[in-house]
Design a protein with these regions (language model features):
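The feature captures the beta-strand-to-loop junction immediately N-terminal to the Walker
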Residues: 41-43
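Conserved ABC ATPase signature
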Residues: 100, 142-146, 150
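Conserved ABC transporter NBD signature motif
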Residues: 64-72
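Conserved ABC ATPase "signature" region
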Residues: 71-72, 115, 119-138
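Helix-to-loop junction immediately C-terminal to a conserved catalytic motif
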Residues: 56
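ABC ATPase NBD coupling module
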Residues: 73-89, 113, 119-120
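Short coil-to-helix segment of the ABC ATPase nucleotide-binding domain corresponding to the Q-loop/switch region
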Residues: 100-110
Length: 158
C-alpha cells in the first residue's frame, strides 16, 4: 500500500537556528506546496538566506524538523541531498547568470550538466522556457545586454 503524497514538498516545524548566542530563527513553522512557485521575502538580515541554506542541507537546524518530500533533510546523506537539490530551483534577487554565456546558454546550462538529453531536445526545451517567460527573442543576447527584469526572467527559465 502506497501512502498518499503530502501537498507540501517542504515543511518546517518549530525550526530554530543560530550562531553561538545569536538566534537567527526561533520556532519557525511553514510549508511550501508541491508544484508551486513560492517567494520568501523579509527584511534584510531576517534569515531568508539561512532558511534556504537549511532547506538545501547546507546548514543543520538546532531544533525542530525540516522535511523535503517527506524526508528529514538533517538525516539525508550526500547522495540524497544532491538528488533533492536537483529537484529544487532558487531564483536569486539579481539573477545569478553566467556573464560569459548567452541567454540561451544560461538556460541550457543545467540541462547540459544534469541530464543526458540530446542537444536538439535541449534546444527545444530552452526555446519553450524562453517563450514561457517572454524572452525567445533575447536568446542570443549576453547578460550585460539585458535589463535586470529580463535577467530575473532568464534565471526563472533556467
Amino acid at each position: 500500500m502506497t501512502l498518499p503524497q503530502s501537498p507540501l514538498l517542504v515543511e518546517l516545524k518549530n525550526l530554530s537556528f543560530g550562531y553561538g548566542d545569536r538566534v537567527i530563527l526561533n520556532d519557525l513553522s511553514f510549508g511550501i506546496p508541491r508544484g508551486k512557485v513560492t517567494a520568501l521575502m523579509g527584511v534584510s538580515g531576517g534569515g531568508k538566506t539561512t532558511v534556504l541554506r537549511l532547506i538545501g542541507g547546507q546548514y543543520t537546524a538546532q531544533k525542530g524538523q525540516l522535511t523535503f518530500d517527506g524526508q528529514d533533510v538533517g538525516q539525508m546523506n550526500v547522495e540524497q541531498l544532491y538528488a533533492a537539490r536537483r529537484r529544487m530551483g532558487m531564483l536569486f534577487q539579481f539573477g545569478a547568470l553566467f556573464t560569459d554565456l548567452s541567454v540561451f546558454d544560461n538556460v541550457a546550462f543545467p540541462l547540459r550538466e544534469h541530464t543526458d538529453l540530446s542537444e536538439s531536445m535541449i534546444r527545444d526545451i530552452v526555446l519553450m522556457k524562453l517563450e514561457a517567460v517572454g524572452l525567445r527573442g533575447a536568446r542570443d543576447l549576453m547578460p550585460s545586454e539585458i535589463s535586470g527584469g529580463m535577467a530575473r526572467r532568464v534565471a526563472l527559465a533556467r
